[in-house]
Structure formats: C-alpha cells, structure tokens
C-alpha cells in the first residue's frame, strides 16, 4: 500500500494505522505526521519518506516526520524513515523477531517524551535481532510546558543485530535521560559525543551497557566528549578492552558521579 503526495503534507492525526501489508508513505517534500502504526505480521514493512529528492533539498525546510508508537511484539518488520529536516519520535518502536526487521533512520532525530526503541529479541528467547541505524544527531525537544525527553535503546547483537549512532547526542537540546543497553544485550557498540557548546548532552542520568556488554567505544573529543548532568554509569564485560576512547583531549563529566564497571555474566 502506498500513500503519496507531491510536496504536500500527510497527516494521520488520530487512531492507529493497522498495516496488513507493506506500507509506504511518501510526501515528496511535505511534512508527515503519524499518530501510530501497528501491523499484522513479522514481514510487514513501513517506509516513510518526506524528502523531495534523495538526501533532501537544502532549500526545502518542510521535509519532516513526526511519528508515535510503531509496532509491539511481532507486528512490524523493517522500518525506514527519511526526512532531511528532522524526525521526531513521540512513542515506542518495537520491531519483530524476524530476519531483516531493521530500523533505518535517515535524518536528525528529536526525542519528545518517553521513547523506547527495541530490536533486541534474543534476550527474550527470540532468534533475530534487528539493526538500529541513526544517520545523524539525536536531541531533545524544547516544549512549553516542558516535557522530559527520555530515550531508551535496546539493541541486540545476535542474528545480525547492531547499533550505529552516527551523530552527537544532546548537542542542540539536551535529553532528560539516556539508557543504551542498560539492562540486557551483549553487543559491542560505539557512543558518539554527548553534549556540546560547553553544555551537558543529558541533564539527568546516563546508563550505558550492562554486565554482558561487549567493548564500548567512545568517539567524542574535547570538553564535551562525554558531558552528563546526572550520574554517568558505564558497564561492560569486554575485559582489557571493555572501554575505549578514540577522541583527543577527552574530558568526562558526570555532575552526579561517574562509574565505569567492568562486569561479567550472561545476557541478563
């Protein structure tokens, strides 16, 4: 099923889209707003494109997506979101236990409210973990009245699972809290710069990794390499290479405290 306009907005303001087959929503340059999308099968894919051209048009500022909850349990397979001017998440994203159930996010991301992104199925007894790919930055949203912008990421490392975080976190608007594989998952992954402009990237606590996590690499550089307003807790099980820093002149700040724990154990 395809819903398409020519550089005009598309809005599904209320209710839930029940996708019984692959769904493509393409505004070709207009803003897209979707309340929620659920599905009926592990192979059901969702593609939302707001770009007028491949990679976006610099002269067009309306290439945006705002989307709420996507999937629960085994309802939605692959999800691809393209919006050069920003993708705002307002709900949880849960992808199916199925090969190819990957999340591909092409555009800067804004977190509004509580958002959990989950492609870790093997922890719960499944067989396929999907990939999560952020192509750009991740920021909170300035709202009136203020809303806590909390991001939780569960990325599994089995069955082809992986996590890619390509841009700075909280460089524009800080998140309220951040958790990356804090409760489960044995994945090795890289964390980019958290913070920017001598300001924290997360105002509250940041929990990265767990006692089964593989090597965790931090790629940030300088005074905002890892800048947190609350407690920073990093846990891994990578042995001598559990925590690695690839940037230069790295400064780590946790106003509420800092803990790096090289743990051990299974994926729990």
Go through each PLM region and give its residues.
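Extracellular lectin-like interaction modules
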Residues: 1-268
């Amino acid at each position: 099923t395809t819903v398409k306009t020519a550089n005009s907005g598309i809005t599904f303001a209320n209710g839930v889209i029940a996708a019984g087959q692959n769904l493509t929503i393409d505004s070709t340059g207009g803003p897209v707003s979707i309340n929620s999308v659920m599905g009926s099968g592990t192979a059901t894919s969702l593609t939302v494109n707001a770009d007028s051209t491949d990679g976006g048009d610099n002269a067009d500022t309306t290439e945006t997506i705002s989307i709420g909850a996507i999937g629960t349990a085994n309802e939605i397979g692959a999800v691809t979101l393209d919006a050069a001017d920003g993708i705002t998440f307002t709900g949880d994203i849960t992808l199916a236990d199925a090969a190819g159930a990957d999340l591909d996010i092409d555009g800067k991301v804004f977190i509004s409210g509580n958002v959990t992104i989950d492609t870790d199925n093997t922890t719960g007894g499944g067989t396929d973990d999907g990939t999560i790919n952020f192509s750009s930055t991740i920021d909170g949203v300035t709202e009136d009245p203020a809303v806590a912008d909390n991001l939780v990421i569960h990325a599994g490392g089995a069955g082809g699972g992986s996590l890619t975080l390509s841009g700075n976190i909280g460089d524009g608007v800080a998140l309220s809290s951040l958790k990356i594989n804090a409760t489960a998952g044995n994945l090795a992954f890289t964390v980019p710069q958290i913070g920017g402009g001598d300001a924290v990237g997360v105002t509250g606590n940041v929990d990265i990794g767990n006692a089964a996590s593989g090597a965790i690499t931090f790629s940030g550089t300088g005074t905002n390499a890892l800048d947190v307003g609350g407690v920073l807790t990093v846990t891994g099980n990578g042995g001598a290479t559990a925590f690695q820093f690839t940037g230069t002149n790295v400064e780590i700040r946790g106003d509420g405290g800092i803990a790096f724990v090289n743990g051990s154990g299974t994926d729990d």
